[in-house]
Amino acid sequence: MSASETVIAVSGLGKVYQSGFQALKSVDLQIRRGEILALLGPNGAGKTTLISIICGIVNPSSGKVTVDGYDITRDYRRARSLIGLVPQELTNNLFDTVWATVTLSRGLFGKPPNRAYLESLLRDLSLWDKRNEKMMALSGGMKRRVLIAKALAHEPQILFLDEPTAGVDVELRRDMWAMVRTLRDKGVTIILTTHYIEEAEEMADRIGVINRGELLLVEDKAVLMRQLGKRQLIIQLQQPLTSLPAAVAGKAVELTDDGCTLVYTFDAQGEQTGVGDLLRSLAREGVEFKDVNSSQSSLEEIFVGLVHDSNQQRGTA
């Protein structure tokens, strides 16, 4: 990846808290300009710590981070001015109006007043009609929209969203997905952490998986699905079986509890999938089937498998 394509570069990043807890372990990560990167990981995996270090909220124990070439330690103000952060918590002054909140946020970054930009921003977030209302009067979903408006008030190039749709209803979640895609189309680089696998599957260009402070992988979503996703051939039988036919007993075939379905798991990228051999073996055994279809592993299954393998490796280390 060339320097012009990389907007955030993380090298050897580590964080050990005073308690001795190691939140991050030598993380290396390059974030591409204009992409949506989703960071997946269970609670306590290190997602929020990673974001907090990049945004200058938490000091790293080791390693280096640059934002558009600016070191987050030596050039803190320049690096931070390029970043907008939407935290998990609803952190707003409840007695301020929506307009006062976003105006103050813009001023804190030393940006001159720009009423036209802020009006456009609030309209895009369906907040313009609420601009004179106090924060305490807004619903939880609207308060979260205000957090996004605050983060974008100083016109950053990069937006971090830490669990952006936690606690919001499905309709609002999909509205926010659409808004995030619009921001990406305008050139904003977006990094989000999420517990919702569907959210990452819906929006991300690339996906990173983090577990126990280690970045397990970062890959294009389509490539990840293709490389790690298993395919299954699902064979609906004409007559139930009591056991697997001898000819397929050594293959990756399972018989469902009701005996009515055979499930064959295979690597779709392999030179030989074995599907043809399986079907011929069943025909020789006189097994008749009424339907055959296939399915691809979901991102959720891939994620669960990666985290499970990581935990097993740590347990045996």
Tell where the protein language model's regions lie, with residue ranges:
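Conserved catalytic motifs of ABC-family nucleotide-binding domains
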Residues: 155
